[in-house]
Every structure is written in structure tokens, then in C-alpha cells.
């Protein structure tokens, strides 16, 4: 714990810094501050009252204060609290993360004659030391994957699905079929429980590539209408889903018959011939390989930056991200990888440790990328910001945002878009820069 002081002509502030970026602060104001707040409070109350013999808002101050002392006092305290928070945010180098980061605020004293004091407990922005760039360990970029004939053939098979015959069948499902599944969660034995859809009419290919072994075993050799009920034993999953019974329903079993690709089908896909289609497909696969290399480089830069330095992180942000990632990982194991309750229990500790590490990395990078963005003198163009706002808007509202979107929502979209661009540009600067960074072979 460390204690420091800040002051100017109107305020004196003492802060005590604790682990988790938790700061307790005492803000003391001289009488000039409380006198100003009192004057504004009286003016606010006065303009809203009507007294006999006076026009609205024109009653003498002493009469208003005498008759509406409670309202004046409440407004005075509100204004004084706001002024104290503004002083704390402007004068102190451990600024609150946001108004929501204030855990508690208490007015200790507030008097127009004698001044006042306020106590705050809040989470502050972390203190990040200078970044030791000479210690950054970034592996060399991996070579772009070469596209093999096998890759090309697999790509053609995927293209052939465009022309495939999709036939619902009554026979039991078999390898290579698609099945349409719906999954609902409910509360066993609760007559008032209404099943809630986790997904409906979602298509899965019965294959080793697209299904885990346990998931595949459940839906191989089953027919349309088949139902699988599964009790959820994990209390974590029960809590996340608000239920303890999963019900899978097979809506359809679909047989896929894909034709051989030829020149005619290639022309339907805007290619001159099958050979031309293969050339275009190869270019597409090569571009995908380049993007995969870029994403790997981006991920390596994230890891390198996160490992570069350690510093204290805001407690609540860390906890919030850890809870979110823990939920995602446990649900993914249960509903996507289709682990049984016993398998989930075996993996649970490792998954929670993984979530904890990932949460710490994510929160560290949130603040480190802001520092890198500032130190490297990076910038965001108007066009980049508008494009990212459009992306964020589509994610929030779909393809058709509301016409009467509020100013608050626009501001939120701007902040989210700016944060994303800041993060991306900072990481890309690290992944591409050479001259000032130590780059080591992998």
C-alpha cells in the first residue's frame, strides 16, 4: 500500500493504492467550492418553485432556502459530489477507469462556510512501466503454406456441394450424411418449465472431421424423429443454461450426392472451364493461406506483447473476463465437444486454469495496446473508423440498423470501433516492425 497527495487552490487529495488497482481517496475542498455548489443548488431549486407574491423563479434566496432547505441540501450534496469526482479525475494520476468503477462514495462533510470532504473507493487505470522493447521475443514469420494437389481436390469437392443433390431419407443415418438437429434445455420434473432452444435446425455432417467421436456415436444409425434426452449433472452447466435436461431432436437425415465437376458446371461458376476454375480456386486457397499466416503472426505478436511485462490489473475487469471465459470453455466442452458430465469434471480444473490465464492475457493486452498505440504515434483515419462502426453496427443490429438510433448508441459504437482499431493497429505494428524490436527465430 502506498499513499500520495495532490493539491491545487481548491482541492487537496490523498490516495492510498492497493492491489488490484483499488484506490481509496479522500478529496477535501475549500469553502469556495462548496459556496459555488450551494449557489448553483439554490438556483436550481429556485427556478422550479412558485411562491405567493412572486413570479416563478424570482422568490428571494433566503425564503427559498428556508422553505425548501431539504431540496437545497440534496442538490448541494449532489453537485459537491460531482465536483469532487471531477477533481479526482483531473488532478490525480490514478484516475478511475470510469464512473462505474467507483465502488463507493461518501460525503463526510459538506458546508458552504467550512468546505467539505468526500471519500471514494474505486478501481483505477493500471500503472504500466516503460516497455522493454529489447526484450521482446517474436518468432520469425512462418512460410506461407503451399497449396498441394490434395488441397485443390478437397476444394473442388467443397465446390461440388453447390451442385449436390440433397435428399431427405427415411433410412438410418450413415457416414457422410447431414442431419438437422434441434437442441432444447428444460428443467426435469418442472411442469411450468418451458423448453428453451439452444439451437434449431442446425446442420451437422456425420464425419470424423466435423464431429467428436462421442457426438458422432450419438447420431450415427438414427432416423428422423429420433430424440436423445440427457440429464445435466454439472452444476456449472445447469447454472449457465438454467436447466438440467438436454433434448436433442433429429429433424431430418439428408443424403448428399455430389456430381463430378466438369467444364459446364465450371462455367456456371463464372469460370471459362474446369481448368480455369482450378486456377481460380488455387488463387483463393493461396489467399486463404496468406491470411492464415497473417493471423498466426498476429497471434504470435499478441503472445510476445503479453509476455513482455507484468503489472497490476483492475480486479473487477479480470474477474469479469475470467467468468466469461470460464463459462464459454465449459459450455464449449459440454455442448460442442460433447463431453459427458464425467469427462467435463475431469477437464474442469484445466479449463478453468486456461480461462484464468486467457483472461489475464486479454486484460493485459487491453491496456498494453493502448500504450503501444500512443508510444508508436499510430492513428485512425475517418474512413477506418466509419468502416469499423459499420461492422460493429451489423454485429449489433444485423443488416438493418434502426433509423432512430440514439446518440448514446452512436457514441457506444464509436468507442467500440475505436477500441478495436487501436488494438489491431498496435498488434500489427509489433508484428510488422523490425528495426527497433529484437526478433528471434522460432
Curated annotation (Swiss-Prot):
It holds the Pfam family Trigger_C. It is found in: Cytoplasm. Its EC number is 5.2.1.8. GO terms for cellular component: cytoplasm. GO terms for molecular function: peptidyl-prolyl cis-trans isomerase activity. InterPro entries: PPIase_dom_sf (IPR046357), Trig_fac (IPR005215), Trigger_fac_C (IPR008880), Trigger_fac_C_sf (IPR037041), Trigger_fac_ribosome-bd_bac (IPR008881), Trigger_fac_ribosome-bd_sf (IPR036611), Trigger_fact/SurA_dom_sf (IPR027304). It catalyses: [protein]-peptidylproline (omega=180) = [protein]-peptidylproline (omega=0). Residues 176-259 form the PPIase FKBP-type domain. Keywords: Cell cycle, Cell division, Chaperone, Cytoplasm, Isomerase, Rotamase. It comes from the Bacteria. Its main location: cytoplasm. One of its GO terms (biological process) is protein transport. NCBIfam families: tig. Belongs to the FKBP-type PPIase family. Tig subfamily. Consists of 3 domains; the N-terminus binds the ribosome, the middle domain has PPIase activity, while the C-terminus has intrinsic chaperone activity on its own. Involved in protein export. Acts as a chaperone by maintaining the newly synthesized protein in an open conformation. Functions as a peptidyl-prolyl cis-trans isomerase. This is Trigger factor. It comes from Chlamydia trachomatis serovar A (strain ATCC VR-571B / DSM 19440 / HAR-13). The gene is tig.
